[in-house]
A protein has these predicted regions:
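Conserved N-lobe ATP-binding subsite of Hanks-type protein kinase domains
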Residues: 32
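Conserved N-lobe beta3->alphaC-helix segment of eukaryotic protein kinase catalytic domains
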Residues: 49-71
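Activation-segment/catalytic-loop signature of the eukaryotic protein kinase fold
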Residues: 82
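Conserved short submotifs of the Hanks-type protein kinase catalytic core
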Residues: 87-100, 104
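Activation segment signature within eukaryotic-like protein kinase domains
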Residues: 123-124
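Amphipathic regulatory helices of Ca2+-sensor modules
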Residues: 310, 341-355, 379-390, 415-427, ...
Length: 463
């Protein structure tokens, strides 16, 4: 059973054999962040370097890595692989060249420039969609703030990426109560300060971010921590800032609905369905979106190795490369939970242009062929994989990078064991089928697949 997370490698060795550190982007108490380049392919990433002895919250770091392995959403940062040596831990991640949302907000405030409601709504919607995905999957972030939101590029319409899951909590049910005040005080809900809360603490934090976007100021401010806690717990805020004279009643009403006690507070899903979000940040027009069902049918006929290569490429697509697919995915994802059901796909056909007539039986078959992790849902990477024009999108360097991901011991050959590590057969029948597939790629019959056999095998079978 293949999953996107199968491609996120864990390496107990020095990183400098594989990555070159281009320049430092920032640093903190834990270590440094670098812009880095993969030596074999030239691809550029961000590298988070931790000094192991300085890691104070090892449990939190493990939680973050585990969650990044599991999550698959266009507005959540991607983790590609990890390296660990005697003194350091390295996380290779998606590069976001636009910096922190906090920096953008601070620059706007300095230049006396605020976001329009449409711009604020566009960005808030992305944050809300990422948080909604987490909540649907039983995760509470617990530290939502502009410093933990990155912009994928310097472009004004850049996609946002949620980061830093070190304080996140995986819940057994969404009725679970959490204890212990964690997070950043300015964005902290009253119930978190009081020490007993649920996932709606994230809703409050989103309200604080929205308030700052629209006004340039935090809703709760005091000269010392105790007074700030008091103001938050008493929910003392106002719309007196000059900027609010130009803010719509719908926006103010939404903020009022958020800054209430937890039981009365709306869910993230409720906010996504609010008048203000829907009117100011509608989905991309279905008139401009096109689902190429012929391409999906072609993809459905590929074998598991081919699909894994295409999924690897889809997983490594930059946000700008994937923008059209993101728009289609979000249009079809009716409840914004970050995955697609068969019913959402059916309804999506009505909204998007498509160039292929398809009956329900064929649609169900295509759905099952797209669902390569067999969980009954189509996740984001699976969706992009099926829609992308892989013959144009997959270059030699992508095939090399995918081969190296299969080649866990870096021997220059893929063994059958390494083959199974990625493709994960669930029983003896699947293992036998994989062995037959492996032998088809092993052109010279020496019991291993080298780089040329891998590339030629992929190209031959795709063509």
């Amino acid at each position: 059973m293949f999953k996107k997370s199968n491609f996120i490698g864990t390496h107990q060795e020095k990183i400098d054999k594989y990555y070159y550190m281009i320049k430092e982007l920032g640093h903190g108490s834990y270590g440094h962040v670098y812009r880095c380049q993969r030596i074999s392919t030239g691809e550029v990433f961000a590298c988070k370097k931790f000094v192991k002895k300085l890691i104070k919250n090892k449990k939190g770091l493990k939680t973050e890595i585990d969650l990044l392995r599991a999550t698959d959403h266009p507005n959540i940062i991607k983790l590609y692989e990890t390296f660990e040596d005697k003194h350091h831990l390295y996380l290779i991640m998606e590069e976001c060249s636009g910096g922190e949302l906090f920096q953008r907000l601070a620059l706007n405030a300095k230049n006396n420039k605020l976001y329009t409601e449409k711009d604020a709504a566009r960005m808030m919607k992305q944050i809300l969609e990422a948080v909604n995905y987490l909540h649907y999957h039983g995760v509470c972030h617990r530290d939502l703030k502009p410093e933990n939101i990155l912009l994928s590029s310097m472009d004004e319409c850049s996609q946002l990426k949620l980061i830093d899951f070190g304080l996140s909590k995986v819940l057994k049910t969404m009725d679970d109560i959490m204890n212990g005040a964690v997070g950043t005080l300015y964005y902290m809900a009253p119930e978190v300060i009081l020490g007993s809360y649920n996932e709606k603490c994230d809703v409050w934090s989103c309200g604080v971010i929205l308030y700052i976007m629209l006004s340039g100021n935090p809703p709760f401010y005091a000269k010392n921590e105790d007074k700030l806690k008091q103001k938050i717990c008493e929910m003392k805020y106002n719309f007196d800032a000059p900027a609010f004279s130009k803010v719509s009643q719908d926006a103010k009403d939404l903020i009022r609905q958020i800054f209430v006690d937890s039981e009365s507070r709306p869910t993230i899903s409720d906010i996504l369905n609010s008048t203000w979000v829907k009117e100011n940040a509608p989905n991309a027009s279905s008139e401009t979106l096109n689902i190429d069902w012929g391409r999906i049918m072609k993809y459905s006929k590929l074998n598991l190795v081919q699909k894994s290569v295409i999924n690897f490429r889809a997983f490594h697509m930059t946000t700008s490369e994937a923008q059209e697919f993101i728009d289609i995915f979000k249009l079809i994802d009716e409840n914004s939970d970050g995955v697609l059901t068969i019913d959402e796909i059916k309804n999506g056909i009505k909204h998007c242009k498509f160039n292929f007539k398809i009956n329900e039986d064929n649609l169900i078959k295509l759905f099952n062929d797209m669902d390569i992790d067999k969980n009954g849902l189509i996740n984001y990477t699976e969706f992009v994989s099926a829609l992308m024009d892989y013959e144009k999108s997959i270059k030699q360097e992508h095939l090399i990078a995918c081969f190296q991901n299969y080649d866990e011991d870096h021997s220059g050959k893929i063994s059958f064991k390494e083959f199974c590590r990625i493709l994960r057969p669930q029983n003896e029948i699947e293992r036998k089928e994989l062995k037959e597939l492996y032998d088809r790629f092993d052109d010279n019959g020496d019991g291993e697949i080298d780089i040329n056999e891998f590339i030629q095998g992929f190209k031959k079978t795709v063509n």
